[in-house]
């Protein structure tokens, strides 16, 4: 499943329904097991009819990032950790950010049996990156239950963690959860590709663009491996 809501006008990335449709197509091509593709959104127009729509809730919608209003605020995603998530997503689900390119078979990543696993090697001071996580619904409901909009963002900032929801996940769960890393083929465009001439790492299965470049940006589209994979 993925998330699509209209970002603030000044935010670095502007997402579209087309990006939801492309992500669903990449997943279908690279994950052979039977699955549903779900989008949690407040803007279903233009999303392909094969994609299930879950209406986006307003919980924590107005809480700004503790790093400033030009930084993304994704606290709404914390509701995926609630016990209610099973009603929307089923017993087991993967959460994916839109700004990624799937480049290989996802089964070795998603057929694991860990009750919770999250991407986790993108910044030395932050244990996790919320661009992708997989869980058995409700298995870490304390992430949702214990979030206090008045105090939790400040706690994560004081700990030196980056981000909004991902920072709280780290603060509440600690640093010892199972992680995907580049050794599993989960790669960072900013950290592992842009700094090395744009070459796709050997064994890469999925590449995330957690930064100023998106898969649809001219810089990314200049790379053949992006064009070969990022399409309907």
What are the residue ranges of the model-derived segments?
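GT-A fold catalytic core of metal-dependent nucleotide-sugar glycosyltransferases
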Residues: 45, 55, 59, 75-127, ...
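Catalytic core and acceptor-binding pocket of nucleotide-sugar-dependent glycosyltransferases
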Residues: 141-232
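Short, hydrophobic beta-strand segments that form beta-sheet elements in well-ordered domains
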Residues: 33-42, 92-100, 116-119, 179-181, ...
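N-terminal anchoring/stem segment of glycosyltransferases
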Residues: 1-66, 88, 137
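Conserved catalytic core of nucleotide-sugar-dependent glycosyltransferases
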Residues: 103-173
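Short, charged, surface-exposed secondary-structure boundary motifs
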Residues: 11, 15, 62-69, 125-133, ...
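Short, polar loop motifs at secondary-structure junctions
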Residues: 38-46, 102-107, 184-185, 211-213
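Residues that flank catalytic or metal-binding motifs in active/ligand-binding sites
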Residues: 33, 49, 77, 96, ...
């Amino acid at each position: 499943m993925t998330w699509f809501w209209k970002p603030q006008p000044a935010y670095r990335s502007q997402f579209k329904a087309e990006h939801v449709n492309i992500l669903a197509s990449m997943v279908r091509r690279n994950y052979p097991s039977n699955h549903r593709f779900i989008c949690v959104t407040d803007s279903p127009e233009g999303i392909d009819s094969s994609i299930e729509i879950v209406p986006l809730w307003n919980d924590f919608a107005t809480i700004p990032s503790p790093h400033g209003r030009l930084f993304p605020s994704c606290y709404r995603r914390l509701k995926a950790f609630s016990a209610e998530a099973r009603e929307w997503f089923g017993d087991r689900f993967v959460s994916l950010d839109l700004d990624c390119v799937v480049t290989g078979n996802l089964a070795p990543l998603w057929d694991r049996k860990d009750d919770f696993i999250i991407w986790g090697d993108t910044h030395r001071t932050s244990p996790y990156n919320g661009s992708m996580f997989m869980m058995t619904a409700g298995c870490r409901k304390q992430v949702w239950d214990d979030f206090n909009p008045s105090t939790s963002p400040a706690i994560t900032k004081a700990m030196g963690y980056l981000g909004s929801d991902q920072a709280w996940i780290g603060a509440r769960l600690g640093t010892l959860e199972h992680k995907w890393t580049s050794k599993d083929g989960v790669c960072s465009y900013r950290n592992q590709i842009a700094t090395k001439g744009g070459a796709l790492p050997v064994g890469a299965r999925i590449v995330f663009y957690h930064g100023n470049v998106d898969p649809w940006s001219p810089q990314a589209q200049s790379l053949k491996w992006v064009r070969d994979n990022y399409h309907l």
